[in-house]
């Protein structure tokens, strides 16, 4: 699913060199994009050339300094001073104190605060969307849409704040009531990845807040400016409502900060979005202390198109799901299974559609396809294409690094591989689509389920019986099981997450709120009698 940024993606400078770095001559400082007139709007988000990456009611940071880069041209944007372990300890302490205030506020009033956060985000949606596009690399419409998703989740959470609760159940004993009580966990740690630096935090943050928790956020180092800008907006809302800023804290940092959160018993729930490999390490650290974790990990998603599929739906769905966000979505389609009777036609039409994709600067509203996030991602793309060729695949479209400033690669289609080729079962976070022929429903359902991940899946068919078999116990084993729509994109009203090596976590809608709370079963005796088991009586 979502990958954590690696250390290679950022320039790290020891804290001892901090003053020297931040007192560079003006000529050198002007190389940062934030100093260029066309990026002056960054200052409207409260950003500057040197930014503090810790917030716990006040801004600070005593850790290393990193520089974040624009994936479209690999130019430096600005610098961020990350959290030290001392900053982390101070932030945890302040967050815990803030919880004592936040937990006493009635849930509907907490919902009102979350609604105000959504309103504040809405006012900055264009600027934040541009920042997401600049620092992450996704096209502008996707960057704005991601902020809109956070706004929508705030609206959803505000309504949900009046509905959370447990049932009253029939008691077996006369004069007794049986009920469920739901209470907040306390401190929710949120570790997000680079590819959705706003929305995934929003899913967790909005629901965690209305359920009575405080939050500590560690975003990906390569999208630190997004984390800071979003936190500044939230902090203003909290300040205006006379609430402690530590209700929504931030500690920018790398793997050391994530490890500290995973091992810290004071973090009552850790929501982690990233690779399966790192997620497994996180899960083991949290489980070792009998903590709670919410994992959103790898996805190796498939679309299946049967002989009766409406190709006017299949083609745009496959295109959108394969190349959207340059193949860096957790729900990106990576495997396309086509019935043998339509395989050749669909591949030819897909190749034609790929040739019309407009590539360029992601903040240009006319562009549909932007860069990969880092140079490392480009290297992984090249390696995957070569592995696919060695395993018998044929690149029928793309497959090369583009001669373009930044981290651009060609959207790629590969045919001729067997369904269980090693490269097919390996998730590569890049726009590579593996296409296969199949003969019948039974075999293709098995192929869909044979990968270790289980996030998203979709079939295209008009056969009602097949649709319900797909949705049933012998159909898709994924957490998202679609019909006649792409694998990518998810409505906030449904629970988002996957099975198997995807981690089993659920975020956003439906009853995902339960993961942020603890349940108590309560028996209340409102009579004067005390019936005991097995008919025991006290004389």
UniProtKB/Swiss-Prot annotation:
Binding positions for (S)-2-amino-6-oxohexanoate per the UniProt entry: 331, 489-490
Enzyme class label: oxidoreductase
Site residues (Transition state stabilizer), renumbered to this chain: 195
Superkingdom assignment: Eukaryota
Residues with the N6-acetyllysine modification: 86, 94, 97, 462, 500
Catalysed reactions, semicolon-separated: nonanal + NAD(+) + H2O = nonanoate + NADH + 2 H(+); (S)-2-amino-6-oxohexanoate + NAD(+) + H2O = L-2-aminoadipate + NADH + 2 H(+); betaine aldehyde + NAD(+) + H2O = glycine betaine + NADH + 2 H(+); an aldehyde + NAD(+) + H2O = a carboxylate + NADH + 2 H(+)
Enzyme nomenclature, EC number: 1.2.1.31, 1.2.1.3, 1.2.1.8
GO cellular component assignments: cytosol; mitochondrion; nucleus
Compartments, as annotated in UniProt: Cytoplasm, Cytosol; Nucleus; Mitochondrion
GO biological process: glycine betaine biosynthetic process from choline
Organelle targeting sequence: 1-26
Modified residues (N6-succinyllysine): 86, 94, 97, 537
Record-level Gene Ontology MF annotations: aldehyde dehydrogenase (NAD+) activity; betaine-aldehyde dehydrogenase (NAD+) activity; identical protein binding; L-aminoadipate-semialdehyde dehydrogenase activity
Pathway given in the UniProt record: Amine and polyamine biosynthesis; betaine biosynthesis via choline pathway; betaine from betaine aldehyde: step 1/1
PANTHER family in alphabetical order: ALPHA-AMINOADIPIC SEMIALDEHYDE DEHYDROGENASE (PTHR43521:SF1)
Protein name: Alpha-aminoadipic semialdehyde dehydrogenase
Species this protein is from: Rattus norvegicus
Organism placement in taxonomy: Eukaryota, Metazoa, Chordata, Craniata, Vertebrata
